[in-house]
Amino acid sequence: MDFFNKFSQGLAESSTPKSSIYYSEEKDPDTKKDEAIEIGLKSQESYYQRQLREQLARDNMMAASRQPIQPLQPTIHITPQPVPTATPAPILLPSSTAPTPKPRQQTNTSSDMSNLFDWLSEDTDAPASSLLPALTPSNAVQDIISKFNKDQKTTTPPSTQPSQTLPTTTCTQQSDGNISCTTPTVTPPQPPIVATVCTPTPTGGTVCTTAQQNPNPGAASQQNLDDMALKDLMSSVEKDMHQLQAETNDLVTNVYDAREYTRRAIDQILQLVKGFERFQK
């Protein structure tokens, strides 16, 4: 009986295809849930696409209805500048001690200037001399230059180092009336030159030697190396380092030789002990 039931059940399962309506209706709950989610996502995507198309259409309609905006033209305001008026220079009394410069050589422009003054005097009642600004005498310029040079010398602060001096500007007036000022260049003292040479030793260490050379001749020298050139100094240091390295190599070689000699001596003693034990047996 059980065999008949199993046979009928197997026959029913084999005769029902998977593509039938009965099988398609019985779906897995997870599959139904996934299909519902997929349908919801597709509907949501289509909704947002429709909203985007409508918004783009509204923007195009609004852009077409608007008129182009004309850019604003910049406005330029021109403010007239007042013409500067020449103020006459004050007349300074000439100094009796200052040398009188040579007068300038007049060219053909003097006749043109005199004609211009005559023409101005004919048009106005004022004399031609009143139309010219007051000029500063050349002796007053010499006084200003002398006072400037004197102030430069008196206001120069004393230097803390005797070997360093501050530059002083000196102004002079040439024969043609031009004023030239000169400032001497002062070279600052150079810092001392320090050279360091390091040499590795066979044992793994490093030996360094430092030498200092002061190029300033006015500085107080506390070492005899100041009078030696830098090239000679470096060659001397290198020679000393080579000699020191050779001595170190000899010392290390002697230590190695002593260690080897001790090892051989111990081996010989052990051989003698073994031979003595064999002799006793």
From Swiss-Prot:
One of its GO terms (cellular component) is host cell endoplasmic reticulum-Golgi intermediate compartment membrane. Its main location: virion. Residues 1-33, 91-112, 149-192 are annotated as: Disordered. Residues 154-175 have a biased composition (Low complexity). Induction: Expressed in the late phase of the viral replicative cycle. It is found in: Virion; Host endoplasmic reticulum-Golgi intermediate compartment membrane. Residues 24-33 have a biased composition (Basic and acidic residues). Residues 1-22, 94-112 have a biased composition (Polar residues). Keywords: Host membrane, Late protein, Membrane, Virion. Its phosphorylation state is regulated by the OPG054 kinase and the OPG106 phosphatase. InterPro entries: Poxvirus_A4L (IPR010396). Belongs to the orthopoxvirus OPG130 family. Interacts with OPG136 and its cleaved form. Component of the virion core. Participates in virion assembly. This is 39kDa core protein OPG130. The lineage of its organism: Viruses, Varidnaviria, Bamfordvirae, Nucleocytoviricota, Pokkesviricetes. The gene is OPG130.
